[in-house]
């Protein structure tokens, strides 16, 4: 058949929605969707969420893309593209997560700085047992930093690597994580929008390839109760107009070599810690991961080469100087999460927020930090709503939609536990 086009966007639930379109759509073009998908929940409940226009006729929105953004796909005779959403009057849709990230990038570019992002994804591999129940993938020889067939007997990760290479994704690493069968996937630093475009497509590709092996590869934050959690670590830096790394003060990194920009970004991330959680750890399951002593970004703190703090300062300097924010999970929309982190960092710089002292505790038995994220989704959404500086920066309409949908989610999940709670999310994240 003629090559077709798969046109996609990543929605408020971090679900990839799209259409297969004919060969004639390969070029600068567009297609329409129902705007009220922004009021659809995981269980397909239709909700009158702010901006979704569920009770105003369920009007169209338009996905627009450029020819240069079209790329090859991992499926035969198919190309793939991501685009931006517009309302039926042709205006940029305020609910569009990709547009939200572009606005966050533009706010930094007004300062002469260009955000660079590298994202680390973690995921668990599940498979059906003889009764059809999802259980952890059988990899008894898996160990932290494991490679080869002991960690992945079916070798589905080899196929993911090969296809990622063929598709032009710049993989830095695939490895087994601490809790078998958990894996980490890291893509190379790039300009913020390009980096997130790559991560949402890579995540989709990895899940679809794994399904061919009978594996449900889930990026949800805590699918296995007795194991650790899965995060989406956001590494960021900034390129200045001369092409240098604006976070760098020289060849050495770490807390003793931070410049004013790094301190300001850190202060903003600390200041907006509780509000950020509602956007970047956005499910009931997220708060099974966000716990003290779990290396997950719970505490309102920062440190150097320290995995039990929320924002970690790389010991590498020069071109590799960066901040690593460790709170987010991949149940969040990556565009929205990166936008929120960039805005929180920017607000710290602009408002001269005070940076508290570095964390000196080990994070297990002792922690200096006195405050963490909320203990559940309901509390995190309340914290987000209170952080009006953050919600206005990210986008008031997008955040209003998010808050409404997540409060509905609190009610939908409050009586679920164990497999029932996992299965509310697992096939979508």
Regions found by a protein language model. Give the residues of each.
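ATP/Mg2+-dependent ligation/transfer catalytic cores
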Residues: 1-173, 195, 372-429
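Active-site capping/gating regions of soluble enzymes
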Residues: 3-77, 81-109, 193-359, 365-370
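Flexible domain-boundary/linker segments
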Residues: 30-31, 121, 125, 177, ...
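Helix-rich catalytic cores of soluble enzyme domains
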Residues: 124-224, 228-239
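Alpha-helix boundary/capping detector
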Residues: 134, 186, 190-191, 295, ...
């Amino acid at each position: 058949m003629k090559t077709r086009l798969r046109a996609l966007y990543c929605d408020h639930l971090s679900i990839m929605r799209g259409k297969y379109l004919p060969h004639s759509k390969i070029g600068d073009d567009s297609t329409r969707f129902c705007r009220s998908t922004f009021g659809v929940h995981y269980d397909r409940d239709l909700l009158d969420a702010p901006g979704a226009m569920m009770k105003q006729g369920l009007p169209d929105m338009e996905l627009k893309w450029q020819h240069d953004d079209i790329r090859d796909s991992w499926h035969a005779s198919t190309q793939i593209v991501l685009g931006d959403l517009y309302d039926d009057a042709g205006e940029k849709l305020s609910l569009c997560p990709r547009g939200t990230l572009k606005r966050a990038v533009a706010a930094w570019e007004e300062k002469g700085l260009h955000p660079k992002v590298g994202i680390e994804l973690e995921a668990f591999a599940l498979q059906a047992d003889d009764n059809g129940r999802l259980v952890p993938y059988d990899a008894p020889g898996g160990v932290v930093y494991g490679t080869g067939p002991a960690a992945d007997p079916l070798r589905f990760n080899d196929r993911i690597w090969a296809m990622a290479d063929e598709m032009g994704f710049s993989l830095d690493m695939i490895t087994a994580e601490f809790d078998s069968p958990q894996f980490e996937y890291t893509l190379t630093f790039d300009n913020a929008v390009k980096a997130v475009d790559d991560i949402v497509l890579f995540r989709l590709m990895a899940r679809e390839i794994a399904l061919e092996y009978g594996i449900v590869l889930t990026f949800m934050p805590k699918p296995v109760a007795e194991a650790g959690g899965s995060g989406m670590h956001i590494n960021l830096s900034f390129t200045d107009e001369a092409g240098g790394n604006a976070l760098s003060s020289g060849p050495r990194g770490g807390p003793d070599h931070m410049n004013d920009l790094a301190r300001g970004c850190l202060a903003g991330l600390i200041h907006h810690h509780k509000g950020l959680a509602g956007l970047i750890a956005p499910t009931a399951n997220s708060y099974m991961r966000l716990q003290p002593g779990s290396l997950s970004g719970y505490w309102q703190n920062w440190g150097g080469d320290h995995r039990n703090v929320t924002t970690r300062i790389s010991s590498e300097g020069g071109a590799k100087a960066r901040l690593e924010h460790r709170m987010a999970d991949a149940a969040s929309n990556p565009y929205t999460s990166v936008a929120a982190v960039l805005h929180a960092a920017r607000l710290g710089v602009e408002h001269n927020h005070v940076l508290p002292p570095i964390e000196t505790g080990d994070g297990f038995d002792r922690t200096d930090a006195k405050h963490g994220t909320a203990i559940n989704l309901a509390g995190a959404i309340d914290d987000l709503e209170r952080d009006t500086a953050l919600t206005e920066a990210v986008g008031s309409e997008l955040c209003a939609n998010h808050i409404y949908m997540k409060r509905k989610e609190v009610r939908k999940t409050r009586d679920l536990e164990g497999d029932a709670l996992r299965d509310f999310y697992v096939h979508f994240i």
